[in-house]
């Protein structure tokens, strides 16, 4: 159902602006509050020395965009209830991240939730979403570079595939969130991509709206998270963004396209897996430090340079994504 506005502005542009403005208002409220509560980030002892000064920077900043996205999407649900699964995944993953952050900063448990606790929560949300979709949506996915109408049915593999995509995307975004503005900027670009693609089909109206909300929230958050960051998104934000991006891609039948446009997420996650596997098998490290953004820092790149290069690569990957879909705008 299309949202009718009393003035001449595209609905997705309108919610983008609203989400952006809402996050701009929340930032100056949440940052001092989290600072007073001493909800500060703990920096890795083995990380780049330039990051030591970030110790104590308030975390859990993902609320700056998670709250606007949730509120706006909830209002939009009155027009189109199909947006509810997107809210469920994003808010569900975000709440798990919030609990994880809370344990880190309040209970002073460095790793937050235990691995099995966090994975149980993520799987619970992911499986619920996947089972719901198996009863309400087809199991088709679009094959890159074959056109948007070329799909393959996953059949009984659909549910485990959806779960895999959600768990992988949320962990990949979480890993990417290691430099000021990196995860938020990459996700902003990726969600703008999905917003544009969703404009090509009327049945994706609700996805277009939600993706625009996420993009607007990310842009607003970036004003506080760009170098030098005044706040970090924490797992509250990274898990929510990973869930949102994964769910959007699944509902648009584009998880394989996400591998392309979200190439930075993929490389970041792979760098960690390669590093761990190499060290276990050979006792040697492939990278100076993983994730790979730290490798570039230790190679002499400034933090801002790494972020800008990764943003630029994401823009180029999104252009490749358009070619992979062979979109026809008319």
UniProtKB/Swiss-Prot annotation:
Enzyme class name: transferase
Q: Which BP terms from GO are recorded? A: cell division; cell wall organization; peptidoglycan biosynthetic process; regulation of cell shape
**How does the protein's chain sit in the membrane according to the entry?**
Multi-pass membrane protein
Query: Where exactly are the transmembrane stretches of this chain?
Result: 13-33, 58-78, 83-103, 113-133, 152-172, 179-199, 209-229, 231-250, 304-324
- The protein's Enzyme Commission number: 2.7.8.13
Q: What is its main location?
A: membrane
Looking at the record's lineage, which domain of life comes first?
Answer: Bacteria
Task: Spell out the protein name for this chain.
Answer: Phospho-N-acetylmuramoyl-pentapeptide-transferase
Q: Which organism is it from?
A: Acetivibrio thermocellus (strain ATCC 27405 / DSM 1237 / JCM 9322 / NBRC 103400 / NCIMB 10682 / NRRL B-4536 / VPI 7372) (Clostridium thermocellum)
